[in-house]
Structures are given as C-alpha cells and as structure tokens.
Amino acid sequence: MSTVPIESLLHHSYLRHNSKVNRGNRSFIPISLNLRSHFTSNKLLHSIGKSVGVSSMNKSPVAIRATSSDTAVVETAQSDDVIFKEIFPVQRIEKAEGKIYVRLKEVKEKNWELSVGCSIPGKWILHWGVSYVGDTGSEWDQPPEDMRPPGSIAIKDYAIETPLKKLSEGDSFFEVAINLNLESSVAALNFVLKDEETGAWYQHKGRDFKVPLVDDVPDNGNLIGAKKGFGALGQLSNIPLKQDKSSAETDSIEERKGLQEFYEEMPISKRVADDNSVSVTARKCPETSKNIVSIETDLPGDVTVHWGVCKNGTKKWEIPSEPYPEETSLFKNKALRTRLQRKDDGNGSFGLFSLDGKLEGLCFVLKLNENTWLNYRGEDFYVPFLTSSSSPVETEAAQVSKPKRKTDKEVSASGFTKEIITEIRNLAIDISSHKNQKTNVKEVQENILQEIEKLAAEAYSIFRSTTPAFSEEGVLEAEADKPDIKISSGTGSGFEILCQGFNWESNKSGRWYLELQEKADELASLGFTVLWLPPPTESVSPEGYMPKDLYNLNSRYGTIDELKDTVKKFHKVGIKVLGDAVLNHRCAHFKNQNGVWNLFGGRLNWDDRAVVADDPHFQGRGNKSSGDNFHAAPNIDHSQDFVRKDIKEWLCWMMEEVGYDGWRLDFVRGFWGGYVKDYMDASKPYFAVGEYWDSLSYTYGEMDYNQDAHRQRIVDWINATSGAAGAFDVTTKGILHTALQKCEYWRLSDPKGKPPGVVGWWPSRAVTFIENHDTGSTQGHWRFPEGKEMQGYAYILTHPGTPAVFFDHIFSDYHSEIAALLSLRNRQKLHCRSEVNIDKSERDVYAAIIDEKVAMKIGPGHYEPPNGSQNWSVAVEGRDYKVWETS
C-alpha cells in the first residue's frame, strides 16, 4: 500500500532553527575539575532523548593550568595531543499544540462543501471513506468519483487518501475540501487524520471521525456536527438506493432542505523533533599530563552536564573530591551537575574539563529541564582516555570485541550454577510427583515454585557476574544484527521492557514497517529492549490475525524486504524483535466436496486432517482439540506429527530469514501448552510470551477479591510449556481495572500480602500490561479506565514481571511520564524478579517498596515511604501516583 507523495507541501515546514538568545555580554568563567575519585556508584540516568542527525561544530584546542584557587585558568595549547574526538547527534522532542477543525458550509446554492483542517504544520493526510444507506457494520466504502479532491488516491477498495494543503503562503493552516455529492446515497463520511512525518494517527474519542449525512446514523460518541442540526436529511427509508437520474435529483432537493452549516474544533498535540549535536574533544596536555575535555553543543537554553568519572576498568560512575567548578552541585552523592557556559552569541553552550591523567574515562548525560535528559542511543555519553601512550583510542566503528579468557573463579561459579540447575530440576520433578498423586498440594507447589524462583535468580546473578565480557563499544556493524550471546531460551535476561509496536489501525497505511524504522532510535533511547511486531503473514483480515499462506510475508504492514530491514534497524539500536505467531488457526485456500473451507494451499498445503475434529463449522478429520475453539477459522490440530514438523520448520525459517529474536503467541488458549514447548525447543527464542486470555471471576456482576483460579489457569499453561514461554498477566490487568475504577485499592494485595496476579506467583514468566491492540485502540474490547492509565504504568513499571507498554500510549500526552518511569526502572535496575514489599493496600491507596530502593503509591490517598536508613526523593509523580527512589 502506498501513500500520497506530498513533497511539495512545505517539506521543511516544521524544521526548527535554534533562535539566538541574547543574555548580554558575559565574561567566560572557566571550569576547573581537579579530580581524585573516591566514591563508586552505579551508572545513572537512562535518557528520554533520541539520537539522529549530525551537525559539525567548531572547536578550539584548550588547556587548563592548575592553580591553588578553587578555579582554573584557561589557556590555549596548540601542542595538545587529541586522544578522542566525536560529534554525537541528539534529538529533542517537544510538544506543539493546535487544533483540528471540521466545517460544513454551502458554497453556492445547493452546493455543499466539507472542509477538514489542522493548525499545526506537517505532512497531513486525510484517510477517509463513506458509509452508504443500508450499510451495516463499521466497514468503510470508497466515495463516488466526483467527491474525491484532486491528488486523492485509492487505498485498496475501502478508502481514499487526500493530502491537506497549505491555505496560503504565510498561513499556518492546512486544509482539504470535499464537495459533497448529495445526489448519492452516502449516509456518512468517516475519516482519520494522519501525520506523514511521524506516522501518528489522530482520531476522535478513540474512534474514527464520523460526519452524518442522514438523521439516524448510529452515534458511538464520535459524530461531528450532529448536535447542531447536521444530519437532518430525512430518514434512511426516504432515500432510495437505486433511482433514475431525474428521480434522484428531485428527491435530493426535497430531502436536503434541513441541511445546516456547522464548525467544530478539537484540540490536537504533536510531538516535534529538533535535531542538535554534542561535540566532544579530549586532549592530553604534555605539560600537566591532564586530560582536557571540551564539550560543546548547539542545544538552546541552559544545559547541565550530569557527569562522573571512570576507573578500574569499569564504566561505573565515581564522584570526585573537591574543589568543584562554579555552578556545580552534588546530586544524591552519586554524580556532579555542572551548568555549561553560554556562548557569547547565545547560540549554544560549552565547557572545559581538566581531569586527572590516570582516569580511564568520563561519563555524562545532558539535562535540559526536569523531564528532559539526553544521551546517546540509550547509553551514557562516554569519553575514553588513553591508558598508555602507545595504545590509541579506537573509534566505535574500528573496534572489534575480544572475549576474555575464563578465570578460575568463573569455572568455579559455572560448577556452582550447575548444582543450582540440578536442584531446580529436582524441585520440578517434585511438583510433577505431587500432581501424579492427585493430592491437594496447591500450597506445596506454590512454595516449590517460589524456591525455584529464588534459585533461578541466584543462578542468573552468578551468570551475569561471570559471563565473559565483550567490549560494549567494539561491535562491528556487520555483526551487530545478530548478537552472539543468548542468555536463555524464551525468558530473556530478566531486565526486558517490551514495546508493542502497533495498534489495530497500523495496517491502514500499507507502510507500517517503514514508519516504525523512523522510531527505532527514539524507542531505544527510551529504554525499550524488546519490540513486538504485528503478524507478518498474508491474512484474510488486514490486521494479520487470520493467516493464510504462512510463507507469504507480504502483508498490509509492508513487504518482506521492509520487514527484514525493520528488524535489522532495531537490532542496530540494541532492541530485540518479536514476531506475532498465530498458530491456533489458519484460513483455508479451497473448499472440500461439501463446500467447506478446510483445504490449504501454498507451501504448507495441508488437507482436512490438519483441522480439529470437534469444530462443526469446518469438518476437520484430525483429533479433538486440546483447547478452546476459535470459530472464525479452521482450528489447527497440533497433535498431528506433520503439522508440528511444518510449524517448527516455519518458525526456524522465520528466525533465519527475517531475524526475529522471539515470539508473541496468539490465542494460546486454543491448544495445549506442551506443543508450545516443542515449538520453543525447536526455534530457541530469546523471549516468548503467550496470550492466554479468559474471564476473571465475578459474583452477581461484582469482581471477586480472590482471583487465584484465574491466575492458576495461566500458570498451568506456563507449566505445560515447561516454563519455555511467559504469559500476559491478564489477572493483574483485570484487578487494576476494578481497583482503580471503583477506588478499591485493597484488591492489589492478595491474602498473603503479595501481588494478586500472575506476577505474585511466577514473576519471571508474567508479562504485565494495561492495554493492547485488542483491549484498547479502536477495538476497545476491554479498555483501561480512562484517565487512570498512568497509575497503571506506575504499577507495572515499578513492579516485578516484564512490563509491556502500548504503542498508542508512548506516542501520546503520556509520553514524558512513561519515559520518566522507564528511565527509573532502568536506572534502578528493576527486573522481573525484583522483590515487592506491599506497605499499604487500603480503600484509596496502594503503596509498595521494591528492592528496597524504589517506593511507589497509586490512588488519591496519602502515603510517604518510611523514614529510616534510606533517604527517599521523589523521582516521578503525576495524577494520583508518586514514585520515590533512594539517594
């Protein structure tokens, strides 16, 4: 699917130029940093920025002569040896606010025009269609030819895309006008607005904008103009579907006398990217043996360097001893903050750092305001220094990672890890034996699972500390697409943060893969480690969840080549990619002799033996289903050897051909989890998660407090996979719904004082979420309570489990708050097995302390973390939620 080329529409309409800020003449205050490290801290502050674009900057060689005072005297030194020089691209994201307007007016007698406009500059596309009289459902149709403005193109057979054009030079409004054909049987006009620059779709109250042209168009809360009389065109029954021309003309004149003009506005905000750069030069001063670092940037406004120094072969931040330069402050005894000096012309700022020659490097991030931190591709800026005069610092592209030899300590730890694994196996056998005895051993099994969790965490901790280290900066670009180390199959490292990279409407553009590529750097800088892509195969439904030919990877999201390029792009920025594998059902190519669709084509040309026998809709000759049936398509019989063989080959082919790192498994309730284990063993994913979604427990319409039966069903499925895949924590989502909506926060603690979802029983296999393409987006099957989304994210992004963030929420007004929570989770190294101590669970407030270094509360009630040996400071806060971290 292609989109409208609109290069002529103000191609650089929103390219910002940094305005020069004149603060008057200011004398330069040199920065002197005479550093002697004495305190070690963990690496701080993952950024909210993203990195693209490069710009050049002028630099002057400088040296700092040490004095007995607290400041230094700056003098030029042309003889300094350059040991490091780099220009880092950075990107700031700002929010522009404006409006979308819809106007209906009579331009001439009996000629009506509908205009849609936007006040924010950009490459705007109107994606629209119509509903005809007598239509049922929500599907669009294409409008009559004479209603299509110039420059419109057809999208398949259901929509039109028309570019908005700038009204006039110097005008900030973009608009498209549609001449209404009132002689046709069009009942309503439907549209969404798309920003070609960002790929964002703008809807009305979570649905399409709908402009009714008749009175009784169903109102789903998204009608425009109906309250002002628009739509008074007569009842549907009064407009014949087929008429001769003269009859239609007569009737349209009679029926459209009630048409009235209207004008409506809706607020809109757009995230705008501004490209800047940071230039860093490090020199060795031969006279003082100091390392002189120059940092220069064209970022506007006040820029603060949040920094630390490195030594002893690590990148851990260490705080120096005094003296500090002017405008430097201590941050939580973990880092220093130094405000850069403004340039004389006000366009950017710079600073000079004189560092001890024995140090190994300088780490820093940039702070622009309370919620804006900039780093480089999700990592701290790092300036390495020479360790000897004969070993120059290699650039990132030139370095090649070299594995270290195993030490005796590592070999010993490896043996100890094997002992732990043996113990875990024994515990698993213990669980199995209890099940075979058919005794009531639920509590025993739970205790065993908890013991396994502890042992697994211990083994993983040993693994992380003893795995041979590779240079973090020295990976060849050709090798970056396929990481050499896989920590485990199906369960990841424990520190994953998942981004769902699509919504229910993403297929409509036909170029979703290309749009995602443009967001790779930003998603990496936010701290995401895993991206979930939509189903890639040919599908009867455009969203991809009714697969047909599994080996045809040209879909409504893009071509197979675009898919492969997208995966490579995300690998390049350090993000793993999950494919959405629909294994439960498959749409047939041909009918059988009875006219039933159950014969398949393509490379996997199965017959009706591949279809389960107990679904009467599709007359399968396989065995009975091992799960629940999905009645919209033939359910596949996974008990058949040839089916499992073909699926395993297909998954392995997808891994090899596309480069997927793992799977999101659709509708796993439809077949036994043991088959999933078989598929995971064959494809060896880095991370895998299944969608096991069924109803929670209710009594007389009220949600039960105890949801153990619900989470037990999910845990049983995970057990059936032998833990080879995790599962979405539907239990936690459901309990959050009721707790937040009814102000019943006591629900968030189970009778044993633990989280009440899967995350409370098996956190390393629980993928927590608050929304996805089914529950939210334009489907809205189970939408999270409106206005309380950030409370949900404050919960899942601070708690154990693997959190998943929905695409629509990332690129919304919640962006900065979600980014701050992501930064906190990464900064404090929270993980899927983090320990939760629930401190409060009452009617109007829930509070917990995680790993003794993060405290959080949600709900309107009051809470402050307990005073003690820890010093708490507020890290993130918003409407009815607050998060603290230790200092």
UniProtKB/Swiss-Prot annotation:
Cofactors required: Ca(2+)
Marked site (Transition state stabilizer) residue numbers: D774
Active site per the UniProt annotation: D666 (nucleophile), E691 (proton donor)
Tissue specificity remark: Expressed in developing siliques.
Gene Ontology CC, one term: chloroplast stroma
GO molecular function: alpha-amylase activity; calcium ion binding
Binding site for substrate: 545-546, 664-669, 693, 695, 712, 754, 760-762, 773, 779, 857, 884
Repeat recorded as keyword: no
Effect of C499S: Loss of activity under reducing or oxidizing conditions
GO biological process, one term: starch catabolic process
Entry annotated with the keyword Cell membrane: no
EC number: 3.2.1.1
Enzyme class: hydrolase
Catalyzed reaction equations: Endohydrolysis of (1->4)-alpha-D-glucosidic linkages in polysaccharides containing three or more (1->4)-alpha-linked D-glucose units
Deletion consequences: No visible phenotype under normal growth conditions.
Induction context: Circadian-regulation. Expression increases during the light phase and decreases during the dark phase. Up-regulated during osmotic stress and by abscisic acid.
Keyword vocabulary terms for this entry: Carbohydrate metabolism, Chloroplast, Disulfide bond, Glycosidase, Hydrolase, Metal-binding, Plastid, Transit peptide
Disulfide bonds: C499-C587
Domain-level remarks: The N-terminal domain is not required for endoamylolytic activity.
Family from the record: Belongs to the glycosyl hydrolase 13 family.
Protein name: Alpha-amylase 3, chloroplastic
UniProt lineage: Eukaryota, Viridiplantae, Streptophyta, Embryophyta, Tracheophyta
